[in-house]
């Protein structure tokens, strides 16, 4: 399996003026690969019986290769098939294999591809106290707003995501945080020997932007914790397991038109996971993803490069692109991503102010949840079309070659009030 340094898009540290760009791995180097671990993608159209026979063959070939080693083998290479993933028409599995078995798999007529597993990273974010402009921007039709959003009303329909589920594939969620008002749900934890809590903060922060009562776009939506990270990085072995669980849970619960997945993660281009996101789309499920924080073309990132995900770049309050935000033709929409306040780890009322495309993506995931509660959007294509039809064009400065569309929730007015508090 490839260790995709598919990291959480980590939030960026605050400096005076614009947020300093924080480099994150774009291409998998030697240290990003998980030695001896692979993600195997099978060709489409194989019958269930063929898949079973293929896996029996894998076990026998793997064992024969291990037996042929004069000194024997140890470590992950001896494990064999580890986990199975099935998303719509896509069948994959992860495994620990020796080099000879990996080559045998590549020659199998059943196999589409064999990729080393890689590390994946959270999308980075930044910290500064007292900043809440992002929600005001969501209903301002792209007009520049004051940095301190207590000067701007956030206008929204009272349904506000009611009856919709937002799945957050991340570090977990502090579901006891007062911002979630009992709407936080512990879904799936892929990390072995770790509790289903958020010790890192990233997942709770993202969930708060989606559905927090104060900081959230869709203030009545449910948020489901799907833990695939324990710290700032993970591997596709855990990420695919978690994404597979999310797709199955949405499908089994008949929530396809009332659910959205948020991926505030980024790593080197990794086709197996792009294929997984694409197959979820074909199955009727909407995924929103961060563009990444390298200040480069997002086409080289996964999952930003997934063609039918909604890929989100970050914009500042005065409609400029922060230098850290990725860009390019694959970026669908721009949303608030600098100095955004939300929930945090460490207590049921903890908060933090951060920056990064990790913050931009949940603004759009929250908008998707908000629109799903208001309108009949029968498919991911309809969701994407509605979100993009609401956008305000040609406002982002330095958008490079990206589609120049900023997020808007559809409310037709904007007004200023005196500050009511400094929260």
From Swiss-Prot:
Its EC number is 3.4.21.-. Residues 1-17 form the signal peptide. It is found in: Secreted. It comes from the Eukaryota. Coiled coil: none annotated. The active site is at residues 170, 202, 358. Residues 132-423 form the Peptidase S8 domain. One of its GO terms (molecular function) is serine-type endopeptidase activity. GO terms for biological process: proteolysis. Glycans are attached at residues 249, 262, 349, 389. PROSITE patterns: SUBTILASE, SUBTILASE_ASP, SUBTILASE_HIS, SUBTILASE_SER. Residues 18-123 form a propeptide. Its main location: secreted. GO terms for cellular component: extracellular region. Keywords: Glycoprotein, Hydrolase, Protease, Secreted, Serine protease, Signal, Virulence, Zymogen. The keyword Cell membrane does not apply. CDD domains: Peptidases_S8_PCSK9_ProteinaseK_like (cd04077). Residues 37-123 form the Inhibitor I9 domain. Secreted subtilisin-like serine protease with keratinolytic activity that contributes to pathogenicity. Belongs to the peptidase S8 family. This is Subtilisin-like protease 2. It comes from Arthroderma otae (strain ATCC MYA-4605 / CBS 113480) (Microsporum canis). The gene is SUB2.
